[in-house]
Amino acid sequence: MKKNKSLVKGARWLILSHGFNMDGRAASQTITDKIPYLLEAGIEPTVFSAITGIKDLRFPHKQFLAWGPAAFRFDFRHWISNQYGRGWFYKISTGLVSLLLTPFIAIEKFFLGYSSQWSWAMPAFIHGLKLIRSKKVDLVFSTGGAWSAHLAGLWLKKYTGAQWIVEVHDPLVIRSSPNDQGFQKPKNRDAKFRQYLEKQITQYADQVWWFTDGALHYATVRNPNLNTPNNAHGFMVLPGAEPPGGLRSAESHVYSEKLNLCHFGSLAKDRSLSTILNALVPLFSKYPESRELVRVHAYGAPLDSLTTEAIKNFGFSEVLVAHGRLEKDLETGKSGRERVVEKMQAADVLILLHGRDEWCAEYIPSKFYEYLWTGRPIWGITHRNPQLDGMLRERDAYLSQEGDSKGISDALEKIWLDWRERKLAEPKWLPIGVDQAVHKILAEIEWKPEDIN
């Protein structure tokens, strides 16, 4: 089919986002944080999503159940939780539904083997087709996260020729090593389909963007048709973050009697606080007094197994403090989010763990953008990502490379010495907001308010 070469005209955007308004997840926040700026620019959105999130009342927001059994079970659990909480009714109803769907899920997995959410593309496509044929849509915008949104967008593009723009959150093709460019056909059926979908996006989308230079680079290597005539125009956008808790400026830091190193967010074997605990061993040996003065705080997630093992092996039960998820404080009335912001601003140093997998070359943690709003020093332990390293250096962060034990130990020693002298690095106030992302997207797709039909 011929590519629609005309510039984007018209403000009626159909936004396909499987996890829209879904319990604070990064895949949801990435699009929901853009909405105020899109509205301000004159966009008139209609959103299609799964039933897993909270319905938005500012504009048409249609929520559809996925048609496949695995996705139905997933969506049903979240819907029941949103409606009735996770009490006895949740346990009984979701248990019964899971039991009834088990054989059908097994059949779906055996014959297809895709991610559970794939089937949400079907209702999104059917309802999107009706809107487009009714002349109620000027542009289709798929964003994810879940690739079912992109599949629905692809079908709508092929069937109607509507303008289609694509926001890819995480790389669709996961490489295994620096030498792996992603050309090899995966054995996993879901990975194989994602590889196919990436090729289709670069061929049929009008514009497509990724969130890192690395992701754009490797997608271009695999799809040299990108940015050529009658193919997709590809570019990079930094997603940024809204000021957490309404932060608009950094506060003066008050040193306490402890050096508080704070990590916020999820942990895993490839993103583990054991990296920090291992580096504390030589620090405590060289500066014995530091053992009583250094504390590592973990907020927002359970400890990973490597961290738990390191605590046990080193006897660090008093060194690492696991706070878990911060909920609303009934005494003060502060929300969990407000409490998190307070803890971030009170930290001496914020820990940013990047990971050790190859996909780190194409990924920047969303937490990085939140950290920038706090005005606190960041200690980034990164892996194969010059773009992230450059942004950290630009802001006078402490920087180490994953796997470099000596470099990590040296950075920790520098933090200790700086703290002891009350001279921790003073980061430059250079936050990256969501507004700049929306402005770049609108500029790249050449959308102007005066073009509204």
Residue ranges and their predicted role:
Residues W209, H253-R271, L277:
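Conserved donor-binding/catalytic core segment of Leloir-type glycosyltransferases
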Residues F72-F76, F235-K258:
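Acidic anion/phosphate-binding donor-loop and adjacent secondary structure
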Residues M1-D75, Q207, L283, P288, ...:
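N-terminal subdomain of nucleotide-sugar transferases
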